[in-house]
């Protein structure tokens, strides 16, 4: 799936969530700022004009995350975190802070090993969740994530262009 299709697919999920929550605006939280996709999605939300499909979406919290043993994460984190700061998006200190501030969450951490841990509080709080690639580092973790979503009746979505 190419980047444009992925963005349309994510946007559709968030619009569905937007309609389900029946809100005039939707507060989006971002977990994992160590890749360009987190910036791309945040930029789409922050720059939508009234009347456009993503109007009313606002990124209200961003938790950097990062994995010290993944070179791409180490190299990308400062660069992409700075872009979030340039957009005026508040940086928070934990996943719990994101959950507290957001209506919906996008989990964009490069490291699939942390996805179950990062997704758990989001799903337990009943916040709709999109997980970027990879869904998780193992099938066992993927199944646990979906079990949590089902147990807490929380919308969950993931996809990849690769």
Question: What is each stretch, according to the model?
Answer:
Residues 1-9:
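Bacterial N-terminal signal peptides that target proteins for export
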Residues 93, 131, 156-158:
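Hydrophobic residues in well-ordered beta-strands that form the structural core
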Residues 126-128, 133-134:
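Short helix/strand-capping hinge loops at secondary-structure junctions
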Residues 8-19:
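Bacterial N-terminal signal peptides
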Residues 136-162:
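A contiguous active-site-proximal alpha/beta segment in oxidoreductase catalytic domains
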Residues 75-77, 132, 138:
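A general structural signal for short secondary-structure boundary/capping elements
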Residues 1, 20-21:
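Short, intrinsically disordered, low-complexity terminal segments
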Residues 13, 23-125, 143, 151:
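N-terminal glycine-/serine-/threonine-rich beta1-alpha1-beta2 phosphate-ribose binding loop
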